């Protein structure tokens, strides 16, 4: 169940109400194809909105379970996070100098804005979200995304570069490996297993992760 993306945060998280107050709303671009939709400007009203309440999620999970269907939640990280960062912009790299809005389309270089891997508050934030997600979904698995993480800001972010130096990481790809491993370990500490997209194979794969292939006919996942 794809619950979050650049274009909207779609699950109620009690600890972080701005995720749905801000992150679940976006500007309207009537008549425009998805790739052609201009990004939100600061102060522009957001009229397209919607999200699942926690009661909605419980109802969906129960309906599916009655039909022997397992609902696996996906919480994207470190990319596809514009909606979350529109709500909590301090979780982006401090070098981001543009307005972060919920993207109505592909977003262009605004899609470069992802969670800061050098900021410990990011991990606390995501762990708290995982806590609420685990309480709602009985599935054995939690999907953590991991795809299409552009490293534009990580390369110039002092916090990310300090993290790389501290952890002995060779490059920003390894920094994503650190990010995903840290979050995977947290998910596993909750008794769940991790799923992710095939970009996780670009560096050390989190132990036991189930890889979903979407590039190159799934060859990375196959390996």
Name these PLM-found stretches.
Residues 1-192:
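Substrate-binding cleft of carbohydrate-active enzyme catalytic domains
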């Amino acid at each position: 169940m794809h619950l979050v993306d650049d274009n909207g945060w779609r699950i109620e998280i009690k600890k972080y109400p701005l995720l749905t107050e801000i992150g679940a709303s976006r500007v309207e671009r009537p008549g425009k194809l998805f790739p052609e939709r201009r990004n939100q400007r600061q102060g522009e009203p957001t009229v397209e909105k919607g999200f699942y309440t926690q009661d909605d999620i419980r109802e969906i999970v129960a309906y599916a379970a009655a039909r022997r269907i397992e609902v696996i939640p996906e919480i994207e990280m470190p990319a596809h996070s514009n909606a979350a960062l529109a709500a909590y912009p301090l979780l982006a790299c401090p070098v981001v100098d543009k307005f972060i809005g919920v993207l109505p389309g592909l977003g262009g270089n605004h899609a470069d804005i992802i969670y800061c891997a050098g900021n410990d508050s990011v991990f606390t934030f995501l762990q708290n979200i995982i806590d609420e997600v685990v309480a709602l979904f009985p599935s054995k698995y939690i999907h953590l995304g991991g795809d299409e993480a552009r490293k534009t800001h990580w390369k110039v972010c002092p916090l990310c570069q300090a993290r790389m130096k501290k952890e002995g990481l060779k490059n920003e790809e390894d920094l994503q490996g650190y990010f995903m491993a840290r979050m995977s370990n947290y998910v596993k500490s909750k008794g769940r297993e991790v799923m992710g997209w095939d970009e996780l194979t670009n560096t050390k794969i989190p132990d036991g992760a189930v890889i979903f292939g979407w590039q190159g006919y799934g060859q990375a996942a196959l390996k």
